[in-house]
Amino acid sequence: MTEQLELFDVTIIGGGPAGMYTAFYSGMRDLKTKVLEYNESLGGKILLYPEKVIWDVGGLPPTRGEQLIQQLEKQAKTFEPEIALNQKITSFERDEHQNILLTAENGDRHLTKTLILAMGHGIPVQRKLEIEHADRYEVTNLYYTVQELKTFAGKRVVISGGGDSAVDWANALVPIAESVTVVHRRDMFGGHEKNVANMKASCARILTPHELTDLHGQGDKIDAVTIQHLETGEIERIETDAVIVNHGMKGDLSVLSEWGLKQGEWGLIEVNEKMETNLPGVYAVGDLCTHKSKVRLIAGTFVDGVNALNSAKLYIEPEAEKVAYVSSHNERFKEKNKELQTVGAR
């Protein structure tokens, strides 16, 4: 059966920033590439935060998440990799030639010489409020992500959470909302130090260590929340027009252990400096992996992807160059440069 399937040099599971940049670099190394993505579109976790401003990608000014996805997707498609969406991979096996055969939940099958895992923390699912009947407010003014900041202009906003996104949303909403109240279970926030400092210096009301314990409303719309101090038990009712919840995400990575991959803390895949896992021809990049020099920034995932791809290239072609030539030596880029110069001359 496997001989009927098209064989790819590299298959990347995951279409977030790590997966997209790895697909681009795979084209630079002249490898036949396929990207498998669980969602209906590329973007990964950033899809949940399209309005979030990203500051830490080298060479880019502060960029909205949605814009970064668009730019990465355009770059990823430079060498025309095959992209398959709605692919939840459930089965991993080897054929008689030691190629890797992947099967998706919908029955699609994919054959590849090497595999790069760029699945982040697994299929991302927001952690929702564990408050009875909270789901009925999701159609009105209970939010688990911020699609457009203008939705909250002039409103009294309560934000529950203390991670990067909660802090970023607070900073973004303070200038346009009537009021912003941040409720967090801990005294310490998990966001970047500078962003946390900016939030604390703003007019946002910050309540720690507090927990959101109840939602109040008429019909399907919240008009107030109850919060509780976790040490004293003191309760306060706060009137609000919108509630934003960011309690992090959970992802299912159990399938990886079923495949025999060595996992460390939090289920992350252990790799060496070449991004090699304990399985031949299988590599892991981005948030999914852990290694001694790991940098947990988007820029760090790009480096992971480059190193994994170089290892995959040598796995397939042991006599190949260890790294790609600089982009100015790539024939495809020379063609693209001519197109850009032609457009610029008009």
UniProtKB/Swiss-Prot annotation:
Keyword line: FAD, Flavoprotein, NADP, Oxidoreductase
An MF annotation (GO) of this entry: NADP binding
Gene3D superfamilies: FAD/NAD(P)-binding domain
Binding site for FAD: E37, K45, Y49, I89, P124, D287, S328
Organism: Bacillus pumilus (strain SAFR-032)
UniProt superkingdom: Bacteria
Alphabetized PANTHER family for the sequence: THIOREDOXIN REDUCTASE 1-RELATED-RELATED
Protein name: Ferredoxin--NADP reductase 1
Cofactors that this protein relies on: FAD
Catalytic activity: 2 reduced [2Fe-2S]-[ferredoxin] + NADP(+) + H(+) = 2 oxidized [2Fe-2S]-[ferredoxin] + NADPH
EC number of this enzyme: 1.18.1.2
Subunit details: Homodimer.
Isomerase found in the keyword field: no
Cofactor mode of binding and number, as noted: Binds 1 FAD per subunit.
Family note: Belongs to the ferredoxin--NADP reductase type 2 family.
